[in-house]
């Protein structure tokens, strides 16, 4: 059984889906005013791995995520560039897709923009006002935080401390408009004619950030959902406010399991755009030749733990991934000459390590322990490939096991590294023939020719092997 760490309870809990065999999952997406950085990608990949493992375990996952495409940061960026807000939002929403496709992040079942649900947001706010949880003030609409019992419990925030901190951040006008400093905006009045806005019962304005996710989760999933994910920095105030407004409206539990991923750190500081210590995925993909190495690094650290990012961590990830690819390749090349049948002891070891992988992933998606099981399969693969004789069923089972488990991490393409052009394949075949008649001069010439094409050839006791440089 899968157990997950629920931020709300601060405990690992057995996972029980609301509907057996199906999971409703919402994950906060980016505010589209810039290219995503590695920290943003870490969150997207962490929950992509969780989704993949749930699917591997037999669940059908309805995965919803969003683009926040109306926000102060987007408005500011639009003013700086002299364009309208939707031009900025469209540009960086498209960039998100372009950056996440090479990282093999599965498309959401539904990816909604906040601006696509404005009527739903207005109806949601009207319900909150009707129930006494929200009030209009000078065109803004605020949520009465203290009216909601348990406000702040997700992030273990103390009300008095929150009130003091909020009061210190607000100017006199904001303090005058609010009944209480910790009340938060669910609708913001428009204060400029050149600012994006919509007509509402309270005048022209736009939604507050927090209400957007509440509306989309309920619209595309349900009033109560199984899993809500996001970075740990979203626990307060974003997810705290989502809980308050969602449960105030429906009277039902909003989310059964709250999951939060850890930061990506640079020199022990959180990577963020505000600190200016970020590296965009866009830049990394432009300068790094293998996106799966980036994916591997971000996928194989347990999702709640921080990642210290540095160039040498990428090189370590590259080396580890190459070990896996090499082991896969070693067995793959033996399949064509393998004997019919299977080896019971190796089959048993394969099944044992698949079971260990599942045990690790069942324990709050512990990818660090799960990858250790894959490296046990790597050892088995290398040892098996070095035998004088191997069996077809076992060799096939071994390559499938490695590929299937790596696919849970979203690190695919093991077999893609074994594809060749027709020209390269012809040279390899010619080299086999040359060695068969002991024409080693021609064999060496062909090896050099293949090397110039980026293909490294090795001669082993089991025959010729190759890999891309």
From Swiss-Prot:
Free-text comment on the cofactor: Binds 1 zinc ion per subunit.
Span(s) of short sequence motif 'HIGH' region: 30-40
One GO CC term, this protein: cytosol
CDD domains with a match to the protein in the record: CysRS_core
InterPro entries in the cross-refs: Cys-tRNA-ligase, Cys-tRNA-synt_Ia_DALR, Cys-tRNA/MSH_ligase, CysS_C, Rossmann-like_a/b/a_fold, tRNA-synt_1_cat_dom, tRNAsynth_Ia_anticodon-bd
UniProt keywords, alphabetically: Aminoacyl-tRNA synthetase, ATP-binding, Cytoplasm, Ligase, Metal-binding, Nucleotide-binding, Protein biosynthesis, Zinc
Molecular functions (GO terms): ATP binding; cysteine-tRNA ligase activity; zinc ion binding
Enzyme Commission number, as recorded: 6.1.1.16
Catalytic function, reaction form: tRNA(Cys) + L-cysteine + ATP = L-cysteinyl-tRNA(Cys) + AMP + diphosphate
Family: Belongs to the class-I aminoacyl-tRNA synthetase family.
Subunit structure of this chain's protein: Monomer.
Listed name of the protein: Cysteine--tRNA ligase
Chain's gene name: cysS
